[in-house]
């Protein structure tokens, strides 16, 4: 969308999901960071299970007038990119295929729109999701940094992976009797850069608290660190999403749907940094 077509001004984008009669969503139209400087874009966050769901969009002027209307989906854009012979798109095709497989695995795991899987347009060969290499699982299963966590009054209890609009690591901590969680801080780092302080939340167990850290391709495989401090001393928890995946992979409770989801997640993240 270019400025020569419309007087962009303070335009907004209104969007709804096809078949959804709920409240519409609005996002700003911003100048695109790529291109000729006259292009504009809007960002709409789509979760992994929503890749085949149609999104209906309207470009609105600052007075509310509808300037343009169109419909698209992650699947639609992915198919056009995969079918393109443009040389610059070739490098993105492996990650797009991995993304569609991750979307399909997410749909099957959560039972969402399983009649329209994200990878349905791929060849049978491209739909095949390989297992996570055993050497990789073994590497992340042996995380000695977890066992080094040590601080008076607070104990690392375990971690889980929360899969939703974002993938988050949730770390659980248990307090000794009489201890107050407000006396501890939880600083999160990625690749040596401090991201901020995580706010502890009380879990269903009254003596248990957890913090959540959003995962990105920067910290999926390495570089994620939480430093817990009581004001006098510090202790470190080095734990990546792959540490949890390696543990879950070896669990007797692992279902085929979860295994496929973890495999697809691994290869999607792998392709993003390849």
Which residues fall in each region the model found?
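Short, surface-exposed linear motifs at loops/turns and structural transition points
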Residues: 1-274
């Amino acid at each position: 969308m270019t400025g020569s077509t419309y007087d962009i001004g303070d335009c907004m984008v209104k969007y709804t999901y096809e078949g959804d009669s709920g409240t519409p969503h609005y996002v700003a139209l911003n100048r695109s960071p790529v291109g000729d400087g006259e292009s504009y874009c809007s960002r709409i966050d789509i979760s992994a299970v929503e890749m085949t769901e149609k999104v209906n969009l309207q470009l609105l002027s600052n007075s509310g007038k509808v300037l343009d209307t169109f419909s698209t989906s992650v699947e639609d854009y992915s198919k056009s990119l995969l079918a393109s012979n443009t040389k610059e798109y070739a490098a993105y095709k492996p990650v797009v295929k991995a993304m569609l497989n991750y979307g399909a695995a997410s749909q099957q795991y959560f039972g969402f729109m399983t009649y329209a899987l994200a990878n349905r347009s791929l060849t049978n060969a491209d739909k095949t999701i390989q297992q996570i290499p055993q050497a990789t699982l073994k590497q992340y299963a042996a995380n000695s940094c977890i066992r080094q966590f040590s601080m008076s009054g607070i104990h690392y209890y375990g971690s889980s992976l929360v899969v939703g609009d974002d993938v988050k690591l949730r770390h659980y901590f248990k307090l000794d009797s009489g201890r107050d969680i407000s006396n501890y801080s939880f600083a999160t780092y990625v690749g040596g850069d401090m991201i901020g302080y995580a706010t502890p939340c009380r879990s269903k167990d009254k003596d248990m608290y957890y913090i959540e850290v959003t995962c990105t391709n920067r910290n999926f495989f390495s570089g994620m660190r939480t430093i817990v401090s009581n004001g006098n001393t510090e202790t470190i928890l080095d734990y990546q999403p792959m540490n949890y995946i390696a543990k879950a992979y070896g669990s007797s409770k692992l279902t085929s749907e979860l295994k496929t989801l973890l495999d697809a997640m691994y290869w999607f993240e792998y392709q993003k940094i390849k």
